[in-house]
Amino acid sequence: MLTSAPPPSSSVVILQKQLCVTIQSSTIQIWGRIALEIQANDNVTLRDIRQEDIADYIRWETIETEWQLWDAPWLYEGRTPEQCERELKEYIEKLGRWVSEASEYSDSSIRSRFEIDYQGEHVGSCASYLIDSDCNILDRCNTTSLGRAIGICVFDPQYRRHGIATAALTGFIDYLKAHGSQRIFTQTWSGNKRMIALAQKLGFAEYRRKDGIRQVRGGVYDGLTFELMC
């Protein structure tokens, strides 16, 4: 997931309705809606969610589940088969809503999340949410937030340690700053050493530590919030 290279700069490309645009030797044709893509570097692209992405998410949720050991793992421990089935159904419905919302975006719509493509392959996503002064998640409509927290997941381990997360979050941060986000945070738990290292690499510093609030695989860990300092 991490590389020694410095975070790359990003450029934003808007694909207008019924417009065929060539981006770095790749021709992309989008009909009937506005689509936004951010070229984080030559290999990493941030883009809006598509209908065909839902199949990937179902696979990641049910088969290729290693990522659940690291991304809020306390949500996945001890679930019954009935609970898994119910939550999967709700998740698929939520994915459908995201696709529907994305289909209504205009060129001025501010995105709170992007899918991540690596060399044209859908490998993950990054998202953002508002937090309050105690670093708890707020409803998106709340106007009294401390700032916006960002998160990322590269689901398949084979795509980690390729600099994907570094490039994707750099592009996402640039996008959020360009659209008015003044304070940017990221949150994780003290057992996720890769995410901590990534946050520090990108210029985040520890802002808040909540001792012992996470229990993962029999261990007790701290909840961490980092703030971007540059």
Please report, for each region that a protein language model flagged, where it lies by residue.
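GNAT-family acyltransferases
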Residues: 2-6, 15-157, 219-230
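Amphipathic alpha-helical recognition patches that constitute DNA-binding helices
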Residues: 56, 149, 167, 183, ...
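Conserved beta-strand-loop-alpha-helix junction that forms the acyl-donor binding cleft
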Residues: 155, 186-196
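Conserved acetyl-CoA-binding loop-helix of GNAT-fold acetyltransferases
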Residues: 161-175, 197-201
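Short secondary-structure boundary/hinge segments and terminal tails
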Residues: 177, 194, 216-217
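Conserved catalytic-core motifs of GNAT/GCN5-like acyltransferases
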Residues: 133, 185-188, 205-221
